[in-house]
């Protein structure tokens, strides 16, 4: 699987993900890009789960963002509704984190659209490790990028499905 973490702190929103792609117990690739900018570059998205399924969902989210420009929450809710009710989409096995300048969200196949309480959110096989590390570091003087990078490093030290090849995307956040 993988680990994706997002941090909203100090006027920045940062999303970081590792690069490992596993097939069963085998590492197939170590430098995949699971965090990227979508839409007009004003939204960052990261995914965990089946890669083909995640790309399908990213494409759907981009279409929703075209339909609802500048409204990430609305686009995410509409995607989650489709994901939950569509017979084809319902079978997709992936999770997504998305963020823009004003909101960070987790979108799940159960139709959940979740906003973090404390400025940190993480998904994937190492998500719980990364989230715990990030929460512990949020009250320090570390920048959002430093918190994300360290949280992902800790997750990679613990989770065998997460590596240290980190991709980071950053946006300016609203105060």
Swiss-Prot record:
Top-level enzyme category: hydrolase
Major subcellular site: cytoplasm
Catalyses which reaction(s): ATP-dependent cleavage of peptide bonds with broad specificity
Regulation: Allosterically activated by HslU binding.
Compartmental location: Cytoplasm
Record flagged with keyword Cytoplasm: yes
Annotated GO biological process: proteolysis involved in protein catabolic process
Residues reported in the UniProt entry to bind Na(+): 156, 159, 162
HAMAP family: HslV
Active-site residues per Swiss-Prot or TrEMBL entry: 2
Keyword flag Metal-binding: yes
Keyword vocabulary terms for this entry: Allosteric enzyme, Cytoplasm, Hydrolase, Metal-binding, Protease, Sodium, Stress response, Threonine protease
Subunit record text: A double ring-shaped homohexamer of HslV is capped on each side by a ring-shaped HslU homohexamer. The assembly of the HslU/HslV complex is dependent on binding of ATP.
GO function terms (MF aspect): metal ion binding; threonine-type endopeptidase activity
EC number(s) given by UniProt: 3.4.25.2
GO CC, any one term: proteasome core complex
PANTHER family reported for this sequence: ATP-DEPENDENT PROTEASE SUBUNIT HSLV, METALLOPROTEASE TLDD
Function: Protease subunit of a proteasome-like degradation complex believed to be a general protein degrading machinery.
Family recorded in the similarity comment: Belongs to the peptidase T1B family. HslV subfamily.
Name of the protein this chain belongs to: ATP-dependent protease subunit HslV
């Amino acid at each position: 699987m993988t680990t994706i973490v997002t941090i909203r702190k100090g006027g920045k929103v940062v999303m970081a993900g590792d690069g490992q792609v596993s097939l069963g117990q085998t590492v197939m690739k170590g430098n995949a890009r699971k965090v990227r900018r979508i839409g007009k570059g004003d939204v960052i998205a990261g995914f965990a789960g089946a890669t083909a399924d995640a790309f399908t969902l990213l494409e759907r989210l981009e279409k929703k963002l075209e339909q609802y420009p500048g409204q990430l929450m609305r686009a995410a809710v509409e995607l989650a509704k489709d994901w939950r009710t569509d017979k084809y989409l319902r079978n997709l096995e992936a999770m997504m984190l998305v963020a823009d300048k004003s909101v960070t969200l987790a979108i799940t196949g159960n139709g959940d659209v979740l906003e973090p309480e404390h400025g940190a959110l993480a998904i994937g096989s190492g998500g719980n490790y990364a989230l715990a590390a990030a929460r512990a570091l949020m009250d320090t003087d570390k920048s959002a990028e430093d918190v994300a990078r360290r949280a992902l490093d800790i997750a990679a030290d613990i989770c065998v499905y997460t590596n240290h090849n980190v991709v980071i995307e950053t946006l300016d956040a609203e105060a």
